[in-house]
Amino acid sequence: MAWNQPGNNGQDRDPWGSSKPGGNSEGNGNKGGRDQGPPDLDDIFRKLSKKLGGLGGGKGTGSGGGSSSQGPRPQLGGRVVTIAAAAIVIIWAASGFYTIKEAERGVVTRFGKFSHLVEPGLNWKPTFIDEVKPVNVEAVRELAASGVMLTSDENVVRVEMNVQYRVTNPEKYLYSVTSPDDSLRQATDSALRGVIGKYTMDRILTEGRTVIRSDTQRELEETIRPYDMGITLLDVNFQAARPPEEVKAAFDDAIAARENEQQYIREAEAYTNEVQPRANGQAQRILEEARAYKAQTILEAQGEVARFAKLLPEYKAAPEITRERLYIETMEKVLGNTRKVLVNDKGGNLMVLPLDQMLKGGNAPAAKSDNGASNLLRLPPASSSTTSGASNTSSTSQGDIMDQRRANAQRNDYQRQGE
């Protein structure tokens, strides 16, 4: 056996411990020769404990005052410590790698104090020294605010509003205020209450929604600006405004009335748009007719002037004949449009000729033509004490003269009988 080979200087190698001269094992009263029995288990465990203790650089002492060989044990212990330290360093370094998403920015703090920002991708930090908090800077965040608020006319209305914002500065978002979302909610509630208190309930529920939305956004921006929370307001949506249930029916009626008013206004505007072009066309047509009539009248007047200019030599040659001819032409024009003609015959009777009825009777059969003479109305002569001109025959004179009204009545009665 390897522990019982020659050349060992008379010493046998004991596999359970260090050998001693004479083949005695350390700490064991039995001999280490071939005649030895099975080793003692207690002795084996004791020696293993000494060896394990020697790995840490300690020195073991053998029983009986003898010292075993301790040369390689300190070197082996140093290697183990180095390997363990290296493993710890590797694990520490590997644990420092982390990833920031594309929509995020990393806020790095060193021993609790802000250090720097990191971009998206794979990054490294010293573990237990730096701490990284990722913040999403691209997502649109929403915050809802609602509550029962008092209006300027001392009414109560329930208002709901939605605020949309985005984080633009991660450092200020995390460390400017304790809780940025809660601070923004409180600022929104304060701004909304301030704006609602400026308007009446009637305007809030009807046409004032756009104005309230813009005023609330402006007030909210002015409120959060001193805090520099690192956020940007994107939009403020005025979602709903409801009156209390006790008066909701009355407000619904008022809203319906306003809607009807707007409907009637739109219908009136549509009617105006329809009628106005037609009226403009008629007005333009009347203007064109007036211009045409003006031009026609001017041309007729110019024609009359030219005609009289041509008649002037004839009038100078024969004044009486020319005057008579002009009189006859004028009477033809005047009597051509007259339905009744009054004729004063030589007997002093005034005849009325209803030309329209006579023209109608001319188209009737011959059997009825005998009644044409009855269409003539003879009035009694107008007596006067003195002779008057032809122009005064129809007027009242001194004496007993028939009243002109009676004469007119008789004419009307005759006209009705003739019809």
UniProtKB/Swiss-Prot annotation:
Membrane-protein topology: Single-pass type II membrane protein
Polar residues: compositionally biased ranges: 1-10
Biased composition (Gly residues): 53-68
Family annotation (CDD domains): SPFH_HflK
Segments on the Periplasmic side according to the record's topology features: 101-419
Residues in the signal sequence: none
Cytoplasmic side: 1-79
Cellular compartments annotated: Cell inner membrane
Start-end of Low complexity biased regions: 383-397
Keywords: Cell inner membrane, Cell membrane, Membrane, Signal-anchor, Transmembrane, Transmembrane helix
InterPro entries for the chain: Band7/mec-2_domain, Band_7, Band_7/SPFH_dom_sf, HflK, Membrane_HflK_N, Stomatin_HflK_fam
Subunit architecture: HflC and HflK interact to form a complex, originally called HflA, now called HflKC. HflKC interacts with FtsH; complex formation is stimulated by ATP, and with YccA.
Protein family (similarity comment): Belongs to the band 7/mec-2 family. HflK subfamily.
Function as written in the Swiss-Prot or TrEMBL entry: HflC and HflK help govern the stability of phage lambda cII protein, and thereby control the lysogenization frequency of phage lambda. HflKC inhibits the SecY-degrading activity of FtsH, possibly helping quality control of integral membrane proteins.
Protein name, entry field: Modulator of FtsH protease HflK
Organism: Escherichia coli (strain K12)
